[in-house]
Amino acid sequence: MEKAKLMKLGNGMEIPSVQELAKLTLAEIPSRYVCANENLLLPMGASVINDHETIPVIDIENLLSPEPIIGKLELDRLHFACKEWGFFQVVNHGVDASLVDSVKSEIQGFFNLSMDEKTKYEQEDGDVEGFGQGFIESEDQTLDWADIFMMFTLPLHLRKPHLFSKLPVPLRETIESYSSEMKKLSMVLFNKMEKALQVQAAEIKGMSEVFIDGTQAMRMNYYPPCPQPNLAIGLTSHSDFGGLTILLQINEVEGLQIKREGTWIAVKPLPNAFVVNVGDILEIMTNGIYHSVDHRAVVNSTNERLSIATFHDPSLESVIGPISSLITPETPALFKSGSTYGDLVEECKTRKLDGKSFLDSMRI
């Protein structure tokens, strides 16, 4: 029986490329991709809702409006979205449509490369960056039905020479421009969140510096068609680890779901929009005012799905904990302080994706 080509992970393991597996037209998926029931089935009485209008939508033009009433209304919407949902879409964001189109076509082009070409970017020993899969900690761990390409893009000194500089020139130049635009958009959101949270003036500079000099990473995701989509998962349910994630859907195939009050809600990306979500670190910094949310990616039997997630996180040297002005006698600290972001990153490298397990470990 023909076998899929293997890709080497940074921990020394070798696993099949799911994109290559899908080319074999299997009747059944390999056992390592069969999820435990609790990862697939909904809680008793829960359902999947396909109404994307339940997801808040933030208009960046209104958020930046010089008209005080318009700006305040949109700021209130942003605050509500972060408190009550942890997920929202942004429209009128100012990112040039031609750049977004280039991102989509170049990422599609990368995954269309031959396996031999893609493995030139495979993960090196002890590293999570590169082509492969993430969060694989054991030989018997259930695998996601996806291939990914992960790399740090900011600050510049974190870019790996064997990855970023070796990308095909059109992809590298496109990612370079996209990285800059995502950084600008993230800082608009962080600055407005500070205002909505009424962070005291003495702390605003310190909070902004955590992210203005912070890290940015990108993860390109490829979810091929799956012969048994009811048994597999594209991306295991989890909350994101860092500050803010900005997601761009590459094609028209849906798959992102978020968990709200025991219900999985299917997110339908709006045209010319990004999906944004709060991460665990931002929940810690806001002392639980803003919430990170469990989400997952599901797969289907007929169509491939692609996306790119851009993660905006603190600088590695930043000490993580609740912002002091958000701690009061009525709202005591909910999370531990004192660890640097870099230390927490190293700790998370040893974890598999598992809901909000990291955040739970940080609770007081």
Curated annotation (Swiss-Prot):
The UniProt record lists the keyword Cell inner membrane: no
Fe2OG dioxygenase domain segment(s): 214-314
Pathway: Alkaloid biosynthesis; morphine biosynthesis
Residues spanning the membrane: none
SUPFAM superfamilies with a match to the protein in the record: Clavaminate synthase-like (SSF51197)
Tissue: Mainly expressed in stems and leaves and, to a lower extent, in capsules and roots.
Disulfide bridge map: none
Any GO molecular function: thebaine 6-O-demethylase activity
E.C. no: 1.14.11.31, 2.1.1.-
Cofactor(s) needed: L-ascorbate; Fe cation
Residues that, per the record, bind 2-oxoglutarate: Y223, R305, S307
Cofactor note as given: Binds 1 Fe(2+) ion per subunit.
Keyword Transferase tagged: yes
Keywords (A to Z) from UniProt: Alkaloid metabolism, Dioxygenase, Iron, Metal-binding, Methyltransferase, Oxidoreductase, Transferase
Binding site for Fe cation: H238, D240, H295
Null allele phenotype: Accumulation of upstream metabolites, such as thebaine, but reduced production of morphine. Lower levels of sanguinarine and 1-benzylisoquinoline laudanosine and, to some extent, of noscapine and papaverine in roots but increased accumulation of the protopine alkaloids cryptopine, protopine and allocryptopine, and of the protoberberines sinactine, N-methystylopine, N-methylcanadine and rhoeadine N-methylporphyroxine.
Catalytic reaction equation(s): thebaine + 2-oxoglutarate + O2 = neopinone + formaldehyde + succinate + CO2; oripavine + 2-oxoglutarate + O2 = neomorphinone + formaldehyde + succinate + CO2; (S)-canadine + S-adenosyl-L-methionine = (S)-cis-N-methylcanadine + S-adenosyl-L-homocysteine; thebaine + 2-oxoglutarate + O2 = 6-O-demethylthebaine + formaldehyde + succinate + CO2 + H(+)
One Gene Ontology term from the biological process aspect of the record: methylation
Activity control summary: Moderate substrate inhibition. Not inhibited in vitro by acylcyclohexanediones.
InterPro entries: DIOX_N (IPR026992), IPNS-like_FE2OG_OXY (IPR044861), IPNS-like_sf (IPR027443), Oxoglu/Fe-dep_dioxygenase_dom (IPR005123), Plant_2OG-oxidoreductases (IPR050295)
Family: Belongs to the iron/ascorbate-dependent oxidoreductase family.
Further information: Neopinone spontaneously rearranges to the more stable codeinone.
Role description: Non-heme dioxygenase involved in biosynthesis of morphinan-type benzylisoquinoline and opiate alkaloids natural products. Mediates the conversion of thebaine to neopinone. Also catalyzes, with lower efficiency, the 6-O-demethylation of oripavine to neomorphinone, which is converted spontaneously to morphinone. Supports dealkylation reactions such as O,O-demethylenation in the metabolism of protopine, benzo[c]phenanthridine, and rhoeadine alkaloids; cleaves a methylenedioxy bridge leaving two hydroxyl groups.
Protein name according to UniProt: Thebaine 6-O-demethylase
